[in-house]
């Protein structure tokens, strides 16, 4: 999807037992302004991700992830990056069928044991249609720097709020 206006995306919940993501996309500000704005917003959610705080940035996108580790506690830091295409992904949630997806996408060069990394593998194969293969509770922002496109999605029930 491409828009000319800046987009700010975040997840939030009354519960503190979940990660949070913040994304600023298509902003016309400087990279420094975008990063500063994203970090200010994300700082308000930091209590929800005591295990890790990670940032991805390029000239037109910033993704910030505050992580509460559930699966792959040692190496599942986010945002996750596709090592070949440089696609960036920030996810809040859990992909229940990640083991089956990992088997069916065995050619993808997995870097972690994170259940969420299967989203990057599916994106390579299916583009935006990847969401049809996911089972679980999730919200995510995926940014593809090759064409400056992005996907913003959540589970069909909306267990993880996305704004």
Model-found features: residue ranges?
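N-terminus-centric sequence/structural signature that marks the extreme N-terminus
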Residues: 15-163
């Amino acid at each position: 999807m491409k828009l000319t206006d800046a987009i700010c995306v975040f997840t939030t919940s009354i519960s503190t037992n979940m990660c949070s993501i913040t994304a600023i996309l298509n902003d016309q500000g400087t990279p420094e302004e975008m990063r500063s704005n994203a970090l200010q917003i994300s700082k308000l959610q930091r209590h929800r991700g005591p295990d890790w705080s990670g940032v991805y940035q390029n000239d037109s996108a910033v993704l910030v992830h505050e992580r509460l580790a559930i699966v792959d506690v040692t190496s599942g830091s986010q945002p996750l990056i596709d090592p070949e295409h440089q696609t960036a992904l920030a996810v809040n949630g859990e992909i229940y069928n990640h083991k089956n997806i990992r088997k069916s996408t065995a050619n993808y060069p997995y870097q972690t044991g994170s259940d969420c990394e299967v989203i990057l593998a599916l994106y390579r194969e299916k583009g935006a249609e990847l969401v049809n293969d996911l089972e679980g509770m999730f919200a995510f922002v995926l940014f593809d720097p090759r064409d400056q496109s992005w996907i913003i999605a959540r589970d069909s029930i909306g267990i993880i709020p996305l704004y």
